[in-house]
């Protein structure tokens, strides 16, 4: 949610800011702005809408070597130009961008800022006026005023501050919100995501919570809020420009759907050796073995991936698995087992709700494993252990390859632990072979894009509602399938356990209601699901049947190549991803950037 980019150095800041903000578009936003200063001149440009509108406003009129930019996803205040970032202080001297939520902004306003002319509706405006207040009223330097403000401000935040009277410095601070420093030659940068700086640098420095950084073109100094200097090394990010381009694809989502066979094979080469033996950290295996119950905490698509792997983990390890929604557990953690272990699933590794749970787990001394796509992310740094899903950058807001990669990564973990436990079922489960078959199954489904597109046009082009139904693992897939369809096509969609239809949901079925049924696993489950299909068809529904090879009947719509039952949630989800894609495309919507959504949810 939101994105920050900043640069100080000897280069054209405007171009870098615009390019950086474009790389952060995938995070989600409704307004944007930049501030550039240099040669005793400065300019602030803001707009509601896309980055292109900022670019059009800028033209050739803005130049300078220091600047900050921001994409905003509204939390406090409507998406207006006035509420867009950057924000200025009352005198215009100080300029600030902010991600996060200032929880005590009303208290700050009433205590310190009663004489200040606050124009907007945002909590960010409070922060910049507070800094100016301490400079003017307490006669503090900018650095000391910023520190004093940081001691008072409560909540989650990532700040980048410029004093227009000192165009050679950006002041940065963070707490519970992602922010990085990019190190260049003769310039340095600030960003929410390494993606924003991929053209300029591959060397980065982490900022930890409640740290302040003084960024100049030739130096970076990290301090705590009391002014103590902290030594901090840098690291090199493994990103490539080719990874973040669309190439010949019209949308990132379609590209990322197509990349899933490659991701499966990448995971095989990462978590298994040439002999097919598991290559999972022995410390992780031991920690899982010592747990009497595993708790998978996640949100959105990652939550569904946890469900998709639950049965497999339990059968291969003999360890019970419980799923939890991170946003609920952060406030209301249930009674835990005697030896719990937390597994946190997050594509970005920055999900604020999951981090809230992780902080509590660490306080309680509970071991934790983060499964993420981003090395060095907050959840990765703060968990006891990390496993990477190696999906490559996922730009589209609607997650696809991260879901399948999370399920596959959990499969490697489950097999490794099961083998260590001496479980025969785990030893007999040839994961390398079976996941190779999954990759082939995905490729076969991807070759049927035209067929799926035609089915979507017949079924979903004008509907306002739709339902997915399934049993067993297929039910878990329907949850993810429904989320995909609703978030990018805006069709109100729900995924249900097929057996629950008659307990209430069937009352919503009427003429031409689309019902998409998933059938895999075995003939007994298939027969029951087909019975449910007949129930809705007899009440006027239009049914589309996605069925695994070997269970198909004449008239079924999409046949998915058979895979091992433990991995069917991967192969069965692929046609539903394409259904969502084509439903959005055929409705003329922005597939990659659905309204109101953010890629990384970094506020609670």
Swiss-Prot record:
It is an enzyme of class 2 (transferase). Signal peptide: none annotated. It comes from the Bacteria. One of its GO terms (cellular component) is cytosol. Homodimer. Its main location: cytoplasm. Pfam families: GATase_6, SIS. It comes from Streptococcus agalactiae serotype V (strain ATCC BAA-611 / 2603 V/R). It is found in: Cytoplasm. This is Glutamine--fructose-6-phosphate aminotransferase [isomerizing]. The keyword Glycosyltransferase does not apply.
């Amino acid at each position: 949610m939101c994105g920050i980019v900043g640069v100080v150095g000897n280069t054209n800041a405007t171009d870098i800011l615009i390019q950086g903000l474009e790389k952060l578009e995938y995070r989600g936003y409704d307004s944007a702005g930049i501030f550039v200063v240099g040669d005793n001149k400065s300019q602030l440009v803001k707009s509601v809408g896309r980055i292109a509108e900022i670019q059009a406003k800028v033209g050739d009129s803005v130049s300078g070597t220091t600047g900050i930019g921001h994409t905003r996803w509204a939390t406090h205040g409507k998406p207006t130009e006035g509420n867009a970032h950057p924000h200025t202080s009352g005198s215009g001297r100080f300029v600030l961008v902010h991600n996060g939520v200032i929880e005590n902004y009303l208290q700050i306003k009433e205590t310190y800022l009663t004489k200040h002319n606050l124009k907007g509706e945002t909590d960010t405006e409070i922060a910049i006026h507070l800094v100016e207040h301490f400079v003017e009223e307490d006669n503090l330097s900018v650095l000391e005023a910023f520190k004093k403000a940081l001691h008072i401000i409560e909540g989650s935040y990532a700040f980048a501050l410029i004093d227009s009277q000192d165009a050679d410095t950006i002041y940065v601070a963070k707490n519970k919100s992602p922010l990085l420093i990019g190190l260049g030659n003769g310039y340095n940068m600030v960003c929410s995501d390494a993606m924003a700086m991929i053209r300029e640098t591959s060397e980065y420095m982490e900022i930890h919570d409640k740290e302040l950084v003084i960024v100049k073109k030739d130096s970076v100094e990290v301090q705590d809020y009391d002014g103590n200097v902290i030594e901090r090394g840098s690291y090199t990010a493994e990103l490539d420009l080719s990874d973040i381009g669309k190439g010949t694809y019209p949308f990132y989502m379609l590209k990322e759907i197509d990349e899933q066979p490659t991701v499966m094979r990448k995971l095989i080469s990462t978590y298994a050796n040439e002999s097919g033996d598991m290559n999972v950290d022995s410390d992780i295996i031991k920690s899982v073995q010592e747990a009497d119950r595993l708790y998978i905490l996640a949100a959105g698509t990652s939550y569904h991936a946890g469900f998709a792997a639950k049965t497999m983990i339990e059968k291969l390890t003999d360890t019970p698995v419980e799923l939890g929604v991170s946003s609920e557990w952060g406030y209301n953690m249930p009674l835990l087992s005697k030896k719990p272990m937390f597994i946190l699933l997050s594509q970005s590794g920055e999900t604020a709700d999951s981090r809230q749970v992780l902080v509590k787990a660490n306080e309680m001394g509970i071991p934790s494993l983060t499964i993420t796509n981003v090395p060095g992310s907050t959840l990765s740094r703060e968990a006891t252990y990390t496993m990477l899903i190696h999906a490559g950058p996922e730009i589209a807001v609607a997650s696809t390859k991260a879901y399948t990669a999370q399920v596959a990564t959990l499969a490697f973990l489950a097999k490794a632990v099961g083998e260590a436990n001496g479980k025969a079922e785990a030893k007999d489960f040839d994961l390398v072979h079976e996941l190779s078959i999954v990759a082939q199954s995905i490729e076969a489904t991807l070759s049927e894009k035209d067929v799926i597109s035609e089915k979507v046009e017949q079924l979903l082009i004008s509907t306002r509602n739709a339902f997915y139904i399934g049993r067993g693992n297929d039910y878990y897939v329907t949850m993810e399938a429904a989320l995909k369809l609703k978030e990018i096509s805006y069709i109100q969609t729900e995924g249900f356990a097929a057996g629950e239809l008659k307990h209430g949901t069937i009352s919503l079925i009427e003429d031409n209601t689309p019902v998409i049924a998933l059938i895999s696993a075995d003939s007994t489950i298939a027969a029951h699901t087909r019975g449910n299909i007949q129930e809705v068809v007899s009440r006027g529904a239009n049914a589309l049947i996605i069925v695994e090879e070997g269970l198909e009947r004449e008239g079924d719509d999409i046949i998915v190549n058979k895979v091992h039952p433990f991995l069917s949630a991967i192969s069965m989800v692929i046609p539903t991803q394409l259904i969502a894609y084509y439903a959005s495309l055929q409705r003329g919507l922005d597939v990659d950037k659905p309204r109101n959504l953010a890629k990384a949810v970094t506020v609670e």
